[in-house]
Structures are given as C-alpha cells and as structure tokens.
From Swiss-Prot:
Summary of subunit composition and partner proteins: Monomer.
Cofactor or coenzyme needed: Zn(2+)
GO process annotations (BP): antibiotic catabolic process; response to antibiotic
Primary subcellular site in the record, as a coarse category: periplasm
GO MF annotations in UniProt: beta-lactamase activity; zinc ion binding
Species the sequence originates in: Elizabethkingia meningoseptica (Chryseobacterium meningosepticum)
Name of the top EC class for this enzyme: hydrolase
EC numbers, comma separated: 3.5.2.6
GO annotations of cellular component type: periplasmic space
Keywords: Antibiotic resistance, Hydrolase, Metal-binding, Periplasm, Signal, Zinc
Protein name: Metallo-beta-lactamase type 2
Residues that hold Zn(2+) 1 according to the record: 97, 99, 160
PROSITE patterns in UniProt: BETA_LACTAMASE_B_1 (PS00743), BETA_LACTAMASE_B_2 (PS00744)
Reactions performed catalytically: a beta-lactam + H2O = a substituted beta-amino acid
Amino acid sequence: MKRLKGLLVLALGFTGLQVFGQQNPDIKIEKLKDNLYVYTTYNTFKGTKYAANAVYMVTDKGVVVIDSPWGEDKFKSFTDEIYKKHGKKVIMNIATHSHDDRAGGLEYFGKLGAKTYSTKMTDSILAKENKPRAKYTFDNNKSFKVGNTEFQVYYPGKGHTADNVVVWFPKDKVLVGGCIVKSGDSKDLGFIGEAYVNDWTQSIHNIQQKFPDVQYVVAGHDDWKDQTSIQHTLDLISEYQQKQKASN
C-alpha cells in the first residue's frame, strides 16, 4: 500500500505534462521541466515492441539531445518535430553507451552539424564494432555548459554494459538514467548479454550517493514516470542473483 500511495502521488505530479509528436505513433515527446523534454521512441527487439526513453534540452544556443531515437527511420521525424516545436536546431548529441538505442544517431546528428560526444570507452566499443562514432570523446566524467544550461555526465561503474553513463541536470534535479536504470514496471533486467550484474548494485549505489536530491529519474525503457525505478533496479538485480544461486 505504501508503494501504491507513492505511485499515486507521483502520477498526480505528472498530470500537467504536455505531449507532442503524436502524429508519429513511434515518437512521443513530453515536457518534463521548463526546457527539458522526454522523448520516447518505439522499436521491436526479438519480436517484442519496447519503448526507449531519453531527453533533450532546449537552450538559448540550440537543442542538446541525449542519446537518439531508436531506429534510423525516426531520426528525421524527430529533428523535424524539434524544429517545428522550438524553432531551434540540434547542436549537440551525447550517447550514454554503445547500443543502437543510444549511439545509433551519432552519424545522423553529426551530418546535421551537431557536435557529437561519447566517452572514450564507448568510442572504443563502437570502433571495434565498426559503427559510426562521435567526433569528440571524453573520460568517464565531464561537465558541460551550453548557453544557459549546465549538466554533467557521470560514469557510475559497470551495469547494463561496461560503458553506461548517466546524465544529471542539476537545476531541474533530473537524472537521465539510461539503460543502467530499469523502469519501475520492468519484470526483469532485460538484455544482459553485455551486462556486469555483479557490479550493477554498487554502480546504482554510486548514483544514489552522487545525486542524493534527484527529483525525477528517466529510465531507459518503458514507463519512466514510475519514480521507484532506482530501488526497483536494485530489487531486480537481487532477484536475478538469487535465482542464479538457486540454479547452481
């Protein structure tokens, strides 16, 4: 009951969200805070349709996009929608790890003239896989200032992948968790083919210690409005480890 009450309060907090992009059923854009927007795109993985979430920030210099739409068929529709809504172009793109639902748009955004970024670790993985890479790379942690907006990229440790990072917007107290943070309605850890499950718990604790005053967490997939996602991720890791022990 306590968790249900918490979810009801959180749901009420999201009732004022503005939704855009409904003309394309595979792209949904929702205003979260001031100039910060959550965008959700849909794609199919192993026969099941999933939602992928990320954010973009509108600054006085242009638009900063974290990650990318999931599937290149959505790239142009996405940037067209941004320009239609805000009258600004994408000037920066940052990938939070090497998978296509995060780094898949690096080449597209680069061709638009945006500065593209990833960590050196992500860049190394993309190079080995012969995939398009960011123009600029950085070590695991980096602070950015774009016009009137500041944000921070933080590497908490291994989890969903070796290279997963999160992005923190301090003014809005919004954490973009990417795929290291599971949605509150996730039934399991999802794709773990490149995961480090035994390191994942500590990495989540590192996030909690680094950003103790988070107001909103945007999970990488499915329902991002359920703000129990951090604790739920820890629960899912524990459940997985217990099942592994029981099967050995």
